[in-house]
Amino acid sequence: MVKPVQVAEGSQTGSSTEETSWKEIIPGPLLLMGAPGVGKGTQAKGIMAAWGIPHISTGDLLRDHRERGTPLGAKATQLMDAGKLVPDDLVNQMVAERLERPDTIRGYLLDGYPRTLAQAEWLDSRLAAIPEGLPLIAVSIQVSYTQLLRRITGRRNCPTCQRIYNVYLQPPKFDMVCDVEGTPLVQRADDVESVFHERMRTYAALTAPVVEHYRASSRFVEVDGEQPAGEVMAGIMAAVARLRSET
């Protein structure tokens, strides 16, 4: 098995030369992976801003097709309203259409897709069929189960200003009230411990095998997600720049 690129704790794009190198590269197709709570949303925003590439998630694609009333959206709506999962082939068709848009020429960031091995294999085949196309770089953000539990179950938000706190990691100044509004903080229904464990079981059953699929590639990056968000971002950018320079 090919050893993945690992980004050590504290890894940063420490010099102006390194910063210039990642700014100048063409990022190509990127995949961001990780369990619920690892911070994919935060990192996705940073990557989009740094490289000017679109963020593509299946949730956004489904909403877009439903709002536009497309045939794919109608099929997906019918299935979801019946409590059924949207099949891989339907999701793949939505992704294929999105990747044809001109804003993906320099690259794009996939988030939440592929979620199954079948989707990963379809994506591999599609990318392999593109003449002179850049290969996919897969980035896996790693956070311990215990830390994820604290991040998710400790999360509280202000219903007035939507400011987010964490009772373990970033508590409010006063007990369970917003620092700005003075409003009592609330916990989302899907942030309770029982729901967290169920989400992690689903992730382990469906998505963890996708991580292992890409781990066998020489273009797999593993990042310590327990570092400060800025250091995680710096590690991702440096690793992608290094791998693209070797392509």
Predicted regions and their residues:
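Glycine-rich phosphate-binding loop of ATP-dependent small-molecule kinases
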Residues: M1-T247
